[in-house]
């Protein structure tokens, strides 16, 4: 590597340049080659290595290079054979333009030693460019008045080639008007031109299309063309000419103003202003013509501007002229003859006199609606008139006299289908062409009250939650009346039905205009489950028409009643219940029972029992049944247990939110040999438990007798009213019997509230009531019960079947098919290992049935009145001291039914069970009265004995 004097390589390019310059002088030489333009790639140009005296083997070692000096890679050298060839397309016109000489200058540089050779490659021209005109089309405008031999210069073509290839010759397409003037070689300044050799006529030849062709002198010849479009300009050398010299037109005498008479047409062969024509009447036209006709100056249309009368003038002769706008102007003339024709120019005239408008839709057929008269001023056939009516209408025209008609009713009317008719009466004369006139008759159809209000459906079902606010909107009834005005004005009212002492108006009301139904008082599901009534819709027509719709209002239950405790509460114990238990009892022994009832339904009435946390400790040897409320021992009692146990039992329903009640049970543990001289049930202010219980039983018996008497009187009154009522005057839809019970246990009594279904509608009344006295099995029957054992005297242990005469309420009978028994042994069973909880199962009997047990519902969808009663023998276990007698509850009402366990040899008086609503009732009254007295004595003795046992 060479370095400069400062020791860096910056001096190397300078040194290399000096060496190249030196070798240039030593090895300079020049070669000449030629190649035609547009030669293909690889075309041989020359053996450059051989011509330069270089060996083929030294081309690569000596770094043979070819420099075209900015000409690109048009030429290239094959280093294997030293041949110079064409590498890419060579276009002479692109390289040198129109220059006569065109060469490519090359430099060949070889190294070791450095030599430079000059090579000139001449590019020879070929005829590869055709002649080209400046434009493909040339427009020439020549007036038809130009004289002969007029010359019009043209622009020639150009050829990019040179020499013979650029030598052009011209020729013109054959025609009779022009020839081509081509300058000779001595007239280079004179341009190419067209020479006119025949006069032009625009009307004959408005345009000429010529083709000018240029041909070069190359081999092969190439040509170029240009279209010559020659437009001949017009001169005013033609006058306007009409199609005809005489136009004949016929017009009726009643032609209207503005009617086009004729449109004479004139044409001018000239164009532009020379061909624009102006129409007018001739100057010698009469004033009468000018008063009746008008001619448009531009279009030449003649129109009527005055009245024409055949009797006044039968023909009008109109001279017309057409003048162009050329200079000088030229004119053409014609005549228009207008003949007036007598025609039927008077149309019929209609006169209508209406008599009965509007027409009632119940009008009789043939009713005259209007009188029509027609007139025509013409004579003969032109004055003969016929009338017609709009088709497909319930009316017709009846001819009564010449040119007189009556419009009468032809078919029955229905305003609800069509409320009005627009009739068109057409009168047509016999002229040719006939003339007609029309008149409209509006016929309104008056409404009659022939449509009753109609409801969308015959019955509606509405669900309303209980405890609604008074005046609450519960539903809206709507009836549609197809009539109009007063006949369609609907008012609503309740179909009044009295339900005992209460009227339907005390429950609901309906707005007379809007049809909105309102609850007048808070509805109570426990009192009223279904309110069925009818709403009447009546229009204001004469006579008024109406229709009824049935509304079934179901009152949905809400948890608005807390559980009510039925456990007897003695005076002096602050509402607590006292029980005595022997210390010798073992585990799983029932020592007491907490009884509660919920007036709600479904889940809202499903009760569960549990001990309060403060009393449910491990040291307390008692537990309470989750669904039975029975208090039983969890283990055997011993001396370490406190002699007095205070239990707090929480009674909770399953409503949302849940409501609760708390019962306090005081359990006293006594020894087996200890006589209960005093009891926590005793009161400080009481003279003795026996006296208190006896007094209470007396009052209870009196109350039962009073209630029974009231029921008997009610039944008798109902029977009388039913027998005297019409079969169609039912106040209640067919319903199910309602169970009414009363019972006495210990020193308290409760009676079930009466659950009603208040209905108002068609159908006979039905009120089936049933009552039974305390201490009896709830089986009904008068003669069928003979020989049936009591609930406590059944020694076989099989469940006792209810008497077929037992009649359930609607909800109770519904529960017979899907009841769930929560048995004492099926819910919680105590054992040595602690309580064993089992889920309720659907069954008809349990391993340890309890006489008179009622099964509570499992789901919220089961009504509390749908529980199934079971009757069977009592629990074989003997009741412990202080244990309450077995009972069953009817959820949904505060009623409690006691099933007393009588001795095995005791006999139940069948007459103590009374069933109301039976046909045999009147035959058994005396027998039942005796049975009631005997049973009351027995009950009084049993109650005294039971109290003393406790």
From Swiss-Prot:
Give the residue spans that cross the bilayer: 698-718
**Which coarse location class applies to the principal site listed for this UniProt protein?**
membrane
Q: GO biological process annotations for this chain's record?
A: homophilic cell adhesion via plasma membrane adhesion molecules; nervous system development
Matching SUPFAM superfamilies = Cadherin-like
Known glycosylation sites? 254, 265, 548
Q: Name one GO cellular component term.
A: plasma membrane
Database matches in InterPro entries: Cadherin-like_dom, Cadherin-like_sf, Cadherin_CBD, Cadherin_CS, Cadherin_N, Protocadherin/Cadherin-CA
Membrane side Extracellular: residue ranges: 30-697
Which intervals carry biased composition (Basic and acidic residues)? 909-923
Q: Which segments carry the PXXP repeats? A: 734-737, 799-802, 832-835, 873-876, 891-894
**Per the record, which residues fall in region 5 X 4 AA repeats of P-X-X-P?**
734-894
Q: What is this protein called?
A: Protocadherin alpha-9
Source organism phylogeny: Eukaryota, Metazoa, Chordata, Craniata, Vertebrata
């Amino acid at each position: 590597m060479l370095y400069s004097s400062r020791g860096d390589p910056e001096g190397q390019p300078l040194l290399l340049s000096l060496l190249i310059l030196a070798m240039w002088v030593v090895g300079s030489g020049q070669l000449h080659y030629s190649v035609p333009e547009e030669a293909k790639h690889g075309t041989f140009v020359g053996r450059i290595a051989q011509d330069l005296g270089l060996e083929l083997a030294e081309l690569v070692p000596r770094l043979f290079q070819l420099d075209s000096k900015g000409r690109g890679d048009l030429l290239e050298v094959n280093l294997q054979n030293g041949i110079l060839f064409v590498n890419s397309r060579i276009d002479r016109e692109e390289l040198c333009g129109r220059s006569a000489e065109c060469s490519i200058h090359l430099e060949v540089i070889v190294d070791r030693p450095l030599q430079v050779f000059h090579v000139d490659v001449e590019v020879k021209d070929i005829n590869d460019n055709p002649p080209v005109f400046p434009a493909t089309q040339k427009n020439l405008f020549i007036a038809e008045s130009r004289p002969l031999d007029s010359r019009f210069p043209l622009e020639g073509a150009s050829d990019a080639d040179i020499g013979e290839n650029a030598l052009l010759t011209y020729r013109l397409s054959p025609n009779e008007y022009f020839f081509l003037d081509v300058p000779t070689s001595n007239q280079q300044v004179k341009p190419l031109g067209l020479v006119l050799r025949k006069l032009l006529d625009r009307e004959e030849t408005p345009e000429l299309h010529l083709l000018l062709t240029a041909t070069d002198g190359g081999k092969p010849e190439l040509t170029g063309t240009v279209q010559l479009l020659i437009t001949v300009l017009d001169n005013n050398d033609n006058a306007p000419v009409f199609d005809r010299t005489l136009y004949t037109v016929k017009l009726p005498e009643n032609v209207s103003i503005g009617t086009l008479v004729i449109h004479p047409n004139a044409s001018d062969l000239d164009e532009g202003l020379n061909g624009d024509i102006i129409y007018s009447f001739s100057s010698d036209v009469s004033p009468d013509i000018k008063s009746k006709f008008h001619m448009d100056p531009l279009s030449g249309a003649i129109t009527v501007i005055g009245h024409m009368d055949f009797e006044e003038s039968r023909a009008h002769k109109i001279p017309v002229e057409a003048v162009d706008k050329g200079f000088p102007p030229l004119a053409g003339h014609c005549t228009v003859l207008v003949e007036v024709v007598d025609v039927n120019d008077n149309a019929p005239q209609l006169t209508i006199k209406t008599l009965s408008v509007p027409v009632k839709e119940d009008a009789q057929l043939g009713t005259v609606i209007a009188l029509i008269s027609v007139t025509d001023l013409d004579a003969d056939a032109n004055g003969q008139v016929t009338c017609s009516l709009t088709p497909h209408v319930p009316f017709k025209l009846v001819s009564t006299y010449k040119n007189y008609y009556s419009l009468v009713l032809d078919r029955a009317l229905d305003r609800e289908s069509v409320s009005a008719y627009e009739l068109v009466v057409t009168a047509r004369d016999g002229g040719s062409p006939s003339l007609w006139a029309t008149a409209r008759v509006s016929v309104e159809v008056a409404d009659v009250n022939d449509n009753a209000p109609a409801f969308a459906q015959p019955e509606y079902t509405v669900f309303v939650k209980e405890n609604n606010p008074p005046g609450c909107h519960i539903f809206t009834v709507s009836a549609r009346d197809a009539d109009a005005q007063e006949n369609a004005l609907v008012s609503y009212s309740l179909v009044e039905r009295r339900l005992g002492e209460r009227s339907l108006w005390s429950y609901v009301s309906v707005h007379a205009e809007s049809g909105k139904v309102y609850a007048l008082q808070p509805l109570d599901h426990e009192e009223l489950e279904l309110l069925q009534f009818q709403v009447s819709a009546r229009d204001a027509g004469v006579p008024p028409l109406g229709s009824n719709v049935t509304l079934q209002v179901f009152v949905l239950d809400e948890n608005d009643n807390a559980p009510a405790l039925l456990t007897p509460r003695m005076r002096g114990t602050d509402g607590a219940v006292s029980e005595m238990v022997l210390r010798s009892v073992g585990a799983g022994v029932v020592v007491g029972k907490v009884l509660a009832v919920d007036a709600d339904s479904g889940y809202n009435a499903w009760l569960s029992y549990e001990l309060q946390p403060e009393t449910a400790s491990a040291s307390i040897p008692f537990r309470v049944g989750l669904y039975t409320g029975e208090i039983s021992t969890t283990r055997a009692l011993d001396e370490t247990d406190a002699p007095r146990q205070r239990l707090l039992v929480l009674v909770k329903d399953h409503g949302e939110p849940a409501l609760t009640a708390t019962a306090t049970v005081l359990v006293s543990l006594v020894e087996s040999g200890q006589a209960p001289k005093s009891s926590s049930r005793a009161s400080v202010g009481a003279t003795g438990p026996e006296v208190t219980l006896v007094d209470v039983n007396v009052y209870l018996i009196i109350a039962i007798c009073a209630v029974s008497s009231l029921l008997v009187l009610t039944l008798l009154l109902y029977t009388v009213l039913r027998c005297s009522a019409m079969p169609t005057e039912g106040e209640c839809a067919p319903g199910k019997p309602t169970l009414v019970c009363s019972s006495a246990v210990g020193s308290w009594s409760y009676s079930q509230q009466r659950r009603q279904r208040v209905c108002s509608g068609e159908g006979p009344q039905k009120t089936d009531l049933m009552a039974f006295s305390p201490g009896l099995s709830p089986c009904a029957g008068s003669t069928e019960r003979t020989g049936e054992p009591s609930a406590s005297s059944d020694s076989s242990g099989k469940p006792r079947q209810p008497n077929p005469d037992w009649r359930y309420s609607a909800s109770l009978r519904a529960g017979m098919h899907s009841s769930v028994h929560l048995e004492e042994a099926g819910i919680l069973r105590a054992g040595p290992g602690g309580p064993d909880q089992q889920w309720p199962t659907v069954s008809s009997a349990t391993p340890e049935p309890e006489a008179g047990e009622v099964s509570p519902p499992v789901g919220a969808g089961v009504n509390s009145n749908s529980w199934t009663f079971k009757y069977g023998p009592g629990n074989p276990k003997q009741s412990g001291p202080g244990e309450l007698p077995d009972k069953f509850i009817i959820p949904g009402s505060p009623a409690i039914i006691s099933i007393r366990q009588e001795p095995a040899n005791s006999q139940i008086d069948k007459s103590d069970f009374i069933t109301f609503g039976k046909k045999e009732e009147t035959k058994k009254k005396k027998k039942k009265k005796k049975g009631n007295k005997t049973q009351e004595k027995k009950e009084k003795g049993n109650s005294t004995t039971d109290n003393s046992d406790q």
